[in-house]
């Protein structure tokens, strides 16, 4: 299989999803996922939209605020690739904000190409040492 990627502006569904995380609202922005989306972020293996929503909320609630920035977005139809940076600011202001790079692959659903069926991504590292 061959895929041809086109660099584009990020779609609204992607911006909405990141905004839900940044705002800590975890609402309709997650509607971009199918009910049974599989998400592999680093060591995470989450199955289903509600598991993704719940686990990301739990992770964010560990004591920081995130702000996602889109650097690049590439579209090959069934596969979308996102590269960016996330500012991770600790709730305890004595800690420093880190800015890890992130890369995400979004595989779209065969039956509804407006929905993500698989999400594979990596963020970080957030520190060395």
Residue ranges, per PLM feature:
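A beta-strand edge to alpha-helix "cap/lid" segment located at domain peripheries
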Residues: 2, 54-129
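Short, low-complexity N-terminal intrinsically disordered segments enriched in polar/charged residues
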Residues: 1-27, 31-32
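A short gly/proline-enriched turn/hairpin at secondary-structure junctions
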Residues: 32, 36-47, 59-62
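C-terminal ligand-sensing/allosteric alpha-helical core of TetR-family HTH transcriptional regulators
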Residues: 13, 52-55
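A general secondary-structure boundary signal
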Residues: 26-36, 108, 119-121
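An acidic, carboxylate-rich microenvironment
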Residues: 28, 50-51
């Amino acid at each position: 299989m061959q895929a041809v990627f086109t660099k584009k502006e990020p779609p609204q569904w992607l911006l909405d999803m990141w905004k839900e995380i940044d705002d800590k609202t975890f609402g309709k922005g997650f509607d971009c996922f199918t009910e049974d989306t599989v998400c592999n972020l680093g060591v995470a293996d989450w199955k289903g939209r509600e598991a993704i929503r719940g686990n990301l909320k739990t992770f964010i609630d560990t004591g920081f605020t995130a702000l996602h920035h889109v650097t690049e977005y590439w579209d090959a139809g069934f596969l979308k690739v996102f590269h960016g940076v996330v500012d991770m600011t600790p709730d305890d202001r004595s800690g420093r904000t880190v800015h890890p790079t992130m890369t995400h692959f979004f595989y779209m659903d065969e039956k509804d190409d407006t929905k993500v069926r698989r999400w594979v991504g990596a963020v970080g590292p957030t520190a060395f040492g």
